[in-house]
Amino acid sequence: MRLVQLSRHSIAFPSPEGALREPNGLLALGGDLSPARLLMAYQRGIFPWFSPGDPILWWSPDPRAVLWPESLHISRSMKRFHKRSPYRVTMNYAFGQVIEGCASDREEGTWITRGVVEAYHRLHELGHAHSIEVWREDELVAGMYGVAQGTLFCGESMFSRMENASKTALLVFCEEFIGHAGKLIDCQVLNDHTASLGACEIPRRDYLNYLNQMRLGRLPNNFWVPRCLFSPQE
């Protein structure tokens, strides 16, 4: 297996089955972050991830981390917190602020460069990338964003600045997603945080099969319309 150099003149990707085993899932480098190429990548189960100053790297790891929304693990303490939550949760109210928050709230550095921010903002304007926002009064305290593929949502990143705020974002989104025929959330690579919330690993081949089925599914036409999903009890 060898790393494939992408052409700037074609948005085609090699098969994910040809990705390297070490580092796990590295498939190709180069190309660009145009909307057409990004959408082609997500349709093939591929995503970009690279450090500032490096070429664009494209990945499709095996196994793949996913979260079945109905399997989201919410602790008893979180359930109690949510019943009296001070947070308001919205969808697609402030995509730019969310991705900027994800880019800046990383002590260890971030792969979300200015070029990445601009690329996903273009996807948002085209109706493919979406955000969930958590507010404490008028302050944005957490958020997450990702790319929709039919009834599958490819989560990209999240940030949190207050207790339980990012968990609130995921909890409310999962409830809304399930309630409107959403099936699966792609978490890309498992980490301690996503594992604690119920994410698990499945073989890449299984993920690609789910993706090929679910990206042809449809959520209600108005699902991604900017709106409030949850308000604190008065």
From Swiss-Prot:
UniProt-listed InterPro entries: Acyl_CoA_acyltransferase (IPR016181), Leu/Phe-tRNA_Trfase (IPR004616), Leu/Phe-tRNA_Trfase_C (IPR042203), Leu/Phe-tRNA_Trfase_N (IPR042221)
Disulphide-bonded residues: none
Entry EC no(s): 2.3.2.6
Cross-referenced Pfam families: Leu_Phe_trans
Enzyme class, first EC level, given as a word: transferase
GO MF terms, alphabetically ordered: leucyl-tRNA--protein transferase activity
Keywords from the UniProt entry: Acyltransferase, Cytoplasm, Transferase
Family: Belongs to the L/F-transferase family.
Function: Functions in the N-end rule pathway of protein degradation where it conjugates Leu, Phe and, less efficiently, Met from aminoacyl-tRNAs to the N-termini of proteins containing an N-terminal arginine or lysine.
HAMAP family given in the database record: Leu_Phe_trans (MF_00688)
Name by which UniProt lists this protein: Leucyl/phenylalanyl-tRNA--protein transferase
Lineage: Bacteria, Pseudomonadati, Pseudomonadota, Gammaproteobacteria, Enterobacterales
